[in-house]
Structure formats: C-alpha cells, structure tokens
C-alpha cells in the first residue's frame, strides 16, 4: 500500500519510524462531543449540562486517547470552516470542579446523579473518549456508565428515535456553509437528535435564511454557535486529529474542510 488514512496514534507512531513513509497531520473535520439529550432528566436543566462541561478536562482527553493531538472546540463548528469558526468558545468551559459542583447543587443534585453514555461499538476513539469522561465525572459525583451498541442500533435508537441520555460521537458536514453543522439544532429539525430547543436560536436561523448578505450570515451563524455553547447543549470536546501516511516517493496530499481523498493531487517524486 502507498497510503494509509485516518491512522490511530499507535499506527502513526509505527509508521513514523519507517523512512519509507511521510506523515501528514490535519483535522478530521468533525465535531466530537458528549451529545446530551436536552429533554431527559436531569439533562433538561441547563445548570446540569453546564456542570458536566466544567467537570471535563478536554486536554486530558486528547492526551490520553491521541497523544495530545486534536483541536479543542467549544461549539458545533470546527477550525477548517474558517470564517464561521469562533475559537474563543473553546475556552468557555475550562475545567472548574468547584464551579461544576456548585451548579449541580443549584440544580438540585448536590450528590450528583447517574448517567448513561451510549457509544457505537465500531468507533474505538469514541469509546476511549467515553472512558476518560467516566473517570473525570466522578469528581463531581456523577456516576457514568458506558453502553456500547451496534452502529445500526445507534442510528435507530439514538439518532432516529432519540432514546438515550448521552452519547459520544462525531458529527461532520456535507457541504461548506455554517448551515451544514448548525441547521440540525433548530427545534423542528429531523436531525436534532439532542432535542435542543431555543427560540432565539430558531429566530437567528430564520434570519440566516432570509439574508442575502454573506457577512451578515456569518455573524448570525456565530451567534448560533455561541448560544449552543452558553446553553451547554452538548459537552463539546474536539475536532479529532487525522493523520495520513503516504509512501515517501509520493507527495501532494492535501486536507480539505470536508472528508475527501483527492488522489488527483498526489504525484510521484521518485
């Protein structure tokens, strides 16, 4: 083989020692998060969701599952989307255990609660992420357990029927506009599997649809991202690292905002 895509950290380390391959580092261009069902108790309480966000140490997640690689994010957008991305949101919920405990107390859960994290069993990185979160949430009295399910079951029970409490997955985009990642969280969207509902968010999206000014649209999308962050709609984690190994007698590999493998750009150098 001349190319290996989406390598694990172990595979990357092995191939990095092989002079026959060059490693290319980029982002996977998806929003990995602990997605929270906003209508299921106690996650229907914004203070509970915020507490979960403050309890997490996302850099530790990256360190433990990907040798520190990846980009911490704070809303449903990733860096490759450029003008739509709001980088400062990644600092909104820096780990603060005492603040998390206080929020739980205010929400009526001073002793914590039990949480089920449903994870598709064919994505090891999501399973590993869930395992790190389980340990981190213990610090605020939240007893989390992981429920692994087949991918088909995840699609039907979690995504379609919304029968879940929380889940770790990555959500990507099909096209290059803010709409691709943000429309799904409007209250009536069939893709709104977390049951997020915010009238202001819906109004902002309607403004986007009627606006013909690109700069205005970008600012509206940024406001939507900020609302998702402020409401702790989900516990946002990262745009996972994407590493590709290309045999050294080839060059020209490129990363794109969407997941594509543009083989036409690769050329032989020897």
Walk through the language-model features, giving the residues of each.
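Long beta-strand-rich cores associated with HINT superfamily self-processing modules
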Residues: 244-270
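Extracytoplasmic/peripheral linker and loop segments enriched in polar/acidic and small residues
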Residues: 47, 145-154, 160, 180-248, ...
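Ligand/substrate-recognition segments at binding pockets and active sites
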Residues: 105-173, 188, 214, 242
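Extracellular/periplasmic solute-recognition and catalytic clefts
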Residues: 1-40
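Periplasmic-binding protein-like
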Residues: 25-36, 39, 43-82, 188-202, 228-236
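Structural transition elements
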Residues: 71-106, 124-126
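Ligand-binding "clamshell"
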Residues: 12-25, 161-164, 177-192, 248-251
């Amino acid at each position: 083989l001349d190319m290996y895509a989406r390598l694990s950290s172990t595979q990357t380390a092995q191939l990095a020692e092989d002079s026959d391959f060059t490693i290319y580092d980029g982002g996977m261009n998806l929003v990995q998060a602990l997605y929270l069902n906003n209508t299921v108790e106690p996650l229907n309480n914004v203070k509970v969701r915020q507490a979960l966000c403050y309890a997490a140490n996302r850099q530790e997640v990256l360190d433990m599952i990907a040798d520190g690689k990846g980009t911490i994010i704070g809303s449903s957008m990733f860096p490759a989307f450029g003008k739509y991305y709001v980088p400062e949101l990644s600092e909104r919920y820096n780990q603060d255990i005492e603040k998390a405990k206080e929020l739980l107390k205010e929400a009526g859960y001073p002793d914590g609660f039990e949480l089920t994290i449903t994870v598709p069993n064919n994505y090891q990185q999501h399973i590993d992420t869930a395992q790190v979160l389980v340990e981190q949430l213990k610090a605020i009295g939240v007893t989390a357990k992981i429920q692994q399910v087949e991918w088909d079951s995840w699609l039907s029970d979690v995504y379609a029927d919304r029968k879940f409490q929380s889940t770790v997955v990555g959500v990507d985009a099909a096209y290059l506009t803010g709409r691709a990642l943000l429309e799904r969280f409007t209250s009536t969207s069939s893709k709104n599997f977390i049951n997020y509902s915010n009238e202001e968010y819906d109004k902002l999206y309607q403004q986007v649809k009627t606006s013909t000014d690109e700069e205005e649209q970008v600012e509206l999308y940024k406001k939507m991202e900020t609302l998702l962050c402020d409401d702790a709609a989900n516990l946002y984690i990262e745009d996972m690292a994407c590493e590709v190994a290309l045999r050294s007698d080839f060059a020209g590999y490129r990363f794109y905002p969407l997941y594509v493998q543009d083989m036409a750009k690769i050329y032989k150098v020897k």
